[in-house]
Curated annotation (Swiss-Prot):
Provenance organism: Pyrobaculum islandicum (strain DSM 4184 / JCM 9189 / GEO3)
Quaternary structure, from the entry: Heterodimer of LeuC and LeuD.
Record-level GO BP terms: L-leucine biosynthetic process
EC number: 4.2.1.33
Family: Belongs to the LeuD family. LeuD type 2 subfamily.
GO MF terms held by the record: 3-isopropylmalate dehydratase activity
Name of the featured protein: 3-isopropylmalate dehydratase small subunit
Function: Catalyzes the isomerization between 2-isopropylmalate and 3-isopropylmalate, via the formation of 2-isopropylmaleate.
Highest taxon above the source species: Archaea
CDD domains registered for this protein in UniProt: IPMI_Swivel (cd01577)
Keywords on record: Amino-acid biosynthesis, Branched-chain amino acid biosynthesis, Leucine biosynthesis, Lyase
EC class of the enzyme, as a word: lyase
One Pfam family named in its UniProt record: Aconitase_C
């Protein structure tokens, strides 16, 4: 499962309240949630998110357990999230809604804003196409990979019928 896109880079400890502020949790439409993704730290995020790969530091998605955080990123058009580490609940929520995620140590030191990336979820690496550097991460395998390939948990469960 390979994904290509340009990098949008953020730092450490981006919590779910930043990814989608609580005042927008009344909405269920992914497109509306996407219009407000990352609003507290980057009001321009929705304009640059379509077709992008979000790159972040440590503890991405920490804080409140809200699946709307992953839904908002996907609704904004983010193709994948690559981070040095994830809050476990965000990681699983992303997989369950079909948003590819990959843990890659030190990724923020090796990728700059706007650089093109190729992310291989199944084999666990990123290639910075601007520099040619292959950056190793933790592959997604087994059931989580099957869920991602199906487009999320709902589609995966439907495929079992």
């Amino acid at each position: 499962m390979k994904i290509r896109g340009r990098a949008i880079v953020y730092g450490d400890k981006i919590d779910t309240d930043v990814i989608i502020p609580a005042k927008y949790l009344v909405y269920t439409d992914p497109n509306i949630l996407g219009q407000h993704a990352m609003e507290p730290i980057d009001p321009e995020f929705p304009k640059k998110a379509k077709g992008a790969i979000l790159v972040a530091g440590r503890a991405f998605g920490m804080g409140s357990s809200r699946e709307q955080a992953a839904i908002a990123l996907k609704g904004a058009g983010v193709l994948a999230v690559v981070a040095e580490s994830f809050a476990r609940i965000f990681f699983r929520n992303a997989i369950n809604i079909g948003l590819p995620v990959l843990q890659v140590p030190e990724i923020t030191k090796k990728v700059k804003e706007g650089e093109e990336l190729e992310v291989d979820i199944e084999n666990g690496y990123c290639i910075n196409l601007a520099t040619g550097e292959k950056i190793e991460g933790k592959p997604i395998r087994g059931l989580p990979l099957a869920i991602l390939k199906a487009g999320g948990l709902t589609n995966y469960l439907k495929s079992l019928r």
